[in-house]
């Protein structure tokens, strides 16, 4: 009996609609499609006889979770995680699909929500700092051996915008776009000179980019 009463109380709480700003926490689950690219490098003669000068990531399905807390009616802070189920390609004198790669992103973020908290539609944007992990890839070498590449984690930022939609309850929907550039390396970019600091070598940074179009469900507490 006590268990049933507890469940009933939870359901009543979730179905209730307190004042908009009283619902400060949001949890979202999202799915989408991510457009990805890799980076270029110096030509490398591989054991298969081909020359490769770029690694690329395939566009693919992605999903994620995020949790935010509204510190004011417009400002939100939180953490987000995302995963893209991609494949790693080598490009050069031929295109070679190396294997499956999982790309995981981890970012703390600050967001801004437009309009009042009880509005049906609330446009938003956010900016985050964190890291992107490129998972290991299992592949077969030209000699028929099973090999595995190492995983790599690099600093990344993330930027996003979209709209949240609520129908008056605790459950809503969201749709938006998110761009995540991940720093990979810097190539020599030449020399820069000025009359005060002298001359120094500058780099040309390369980023692996992910552009996600997605949507999902929001639970507001």
Predicted regions: what they are:
Residues 1-7:
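Bacterial N-terminal signal peptides that target proteins for export
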Residues 7-16:
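Bacterial N-terminal signal peptides
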Residues 17-22:
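Sec/Tat signal peptide C-region and signal peptidase I cleavage site
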Residues 23-26, 33-35, 66-144, 150-157, ...:
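Gram-negative (and chloroplast) outer-membrane scaffold detector with strong preference
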Residues 34-63, 152-153:
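Surface-exposed strand-loop-strand hairpins of Gram-negative outer-membrane beta-barrel proteins
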Residues 39-48, 89-95, 135-145, 185-193:
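Outer-membrane beta-barrel translocator domains and adjoining extracellular loop/strand segments
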Residues 40, 51, 86, 168-221:
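Predominantly the C-terminal beta-signal and adjacent terminal strand-loop region
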